Amino acid sequence: MQKVTFPNKILPYFLLAPQIVLTVVFFFWPASQAIYQSFMMREDAFGLKSTFVELANFTAVLSDPNYLHSVQVTVVFNVLTALLAMGVALLLATAADRVIRGQTFYRTLLIWPYAVAPAVAGMLWLFMFNPAMGTFAYLLRRNGIAWDPLLDGNQAMGLVVVAAAWKQISYNFLFFVAGLQAIPKSLIEAAAIDGARGARRFWTIVFPLLAPTSFFLLVVNTVYAFFDTFGIIHAVTGGGPAKATETLVYNDGFVNLNLGSSSAQSVILMAIVIALTAFQFRFVEKRVHYS
């Protein structure tokens, strides 16, 4: 194998510099500020004076019933969003992989939602399911379903889960299609000759060979549901009704101006995501076969 080197030793660093700057500015700096603020407590409304309070913010957060309820809601939302987004994406990718004519058109059509901003995606679903004027809300009422996510917490949770999953389906679809195309067609044809039907071929041949892709998307969707869905939730329900979909970090930090509590919650969430990702790589990856 031929080794490729840059003619100028400084050039690689220049090429990496923009990404390094973005990572430092939009990840490491905010994370360090959140960790710092989690040990501080503001003494005035303008934040001009703060006091070091050690672990008081973490103790208060972990003993707050509202926070514990928020953790439960977050876990339910995360699991449902990841499963729905990956399940629908796999179904669409399998269908698109069988299409002979117009593959490019269908794939382009299915990846468009990923380009929609989270807040815009939330507003679209809010309009469609608005109890007063939404098209789908009208159809639900015509079929005897008392639809009102502004009053029913379960309906509100279902709506934000569907909206968040819809936004992520396109991303998952791209990777599942790539994974399906990488599977040798000779294996599928051999199984068909042996008499294996479509469902059996999928579960015994296709799905196991998609394990690396599925594992990668499981990690990505977990992080997405934790960190990248605020815009959707805030646009669709605003945290209601009755705190059924409340974004407690936002409310404490930007509404109640309690930066210490908000930062402590952010640090705990970051630790949970890191631990969950490490667990996935440590235990789930053992069941993934890459060859």
From Swiss-Prot:
One of its GO terms (biological process) is transmembrane transport. One of its GO terms (cellular component) is plasma membrane. It is a multi-pass membrane protein. InterPro entries: MetI-like, MetI-like_sf, UgpAE/MalFG_permease. The chain crosses the membrane at residues 10-30, 73-93, 109-129, 156-178, 205-225, 259-279. Residues 67-280 form the ABC transmembrane type-1 domain. Its main location: membrane. It comes from the Bacteria. Belongs to the binding-protein-dependent transport system permease family. NCBIfam families: PRK10561.1. Part of the ABC transporter complex UgpBAEC involved in sn-glycerol-3-phosphate (G3P) import. Probably responsible for the translocation of the substrate across the membrane. This is sn-glycerol-3-phosphate transport system permease protein UgpA.
